[in-house]
Amino acid sequence: MSRVCQVTGKGPVTGNNISHANNKTRRRFLPNLQHHRFWVESENRFVRLRVSAKGMRVIDKRGIDVVLAELRARGEKF
């Protein structure tokens, strides 16, 4: 399973670890992903999504029904 938020599309980005001696080694910054069950009142069921913390805030702000409609429009499975 890929490390990508289903709502925002955020994925890993790359950068450097930098030591005290300024040595640089490549690393990945991973998004803060969580599996979360959201109750969908209109469908009378839970929907399980893999979302970032920002994705949860988007769902809180816009509503789960609006977000699910967008996910369905782009063919996302959930």
From Swiss-Prot:
The record's Gene Ontology cellular component field reads: cytosolic large ribosomal subunit
Q: Supply the SUPFAM superfamilies for this chain.
A: L28p-like
Question: Gene3D superfamilies, alphabetically?
Answer: Ribosomal protein L28/L24 (2.30.170.40)
Its family remark reads: Belongs to the bacterial ribosomal protein bL28 family.
Entry-linked NCBIfam families: L28
Q: Which HAMAP family match?
A: Ribosomal_bL28
Instruction: Identify this protein by name.
Output: Large ribosomal subunit protein bL28
Protein encoded by which gene: rpmB
